Amino acid sequence: MFVDTHCHLTMLDLTPYAGDLDVALQQARDAGVSKFMSISVNLDDHIALAEIAARHSDVGYSVGVHPCEDPATMARATTDYLIELAQPEKVWAIGETGLDYFHSTDFIAEQKQCFARHIHASQAVKKPVVVHTRAAKHDTVDIIRAEKSTHGILHCFTEDWETAKAVLDCGYYVSFSGIVSFKNAQDLRDVAK
């Protein structure tokens, strides 16, 4: 049995599945996936994700704003608004949130503030936070520690052992993507061990 803890069902290219999400989900079920958590990247995703989750008992979703979204969208993600969006039973997590300095360093302050608000919402509704971090490992760990966040996952982890240990010590999980299989990813494979 497998659980896909990080899929983007609203972004999936359905061409190989005759344009039908149900076909894609059934193929995954046939391969042993028993639950799917579709991850939100902006404040409008929850509408489509709620509709998908209502049709599929094995699909839940998250609510949140990806750190590469524009500052105006990040500003709309207040703690209270995230708490409001997180009320449905099928909302299993808060996020995708975090810090991404790889794509842009123009809005670091906004990313940090938005990340902290997601953590506050996560704590208020007692649901885990889904964290994206890229080229921002120190600030990510610092915010998790400062906010005393103890329930979450760093997805698509590509950082070093020290970062993994720091978030594991906070009660977080880390997940690895297919990147771990790349020939030049021996350091990442060592972290996964």
Regions found by a protein language model. Give the residues of each.
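Mid-domain alpha/beta scaffold segments of enzyme catalytic cores
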Residues: 1-193
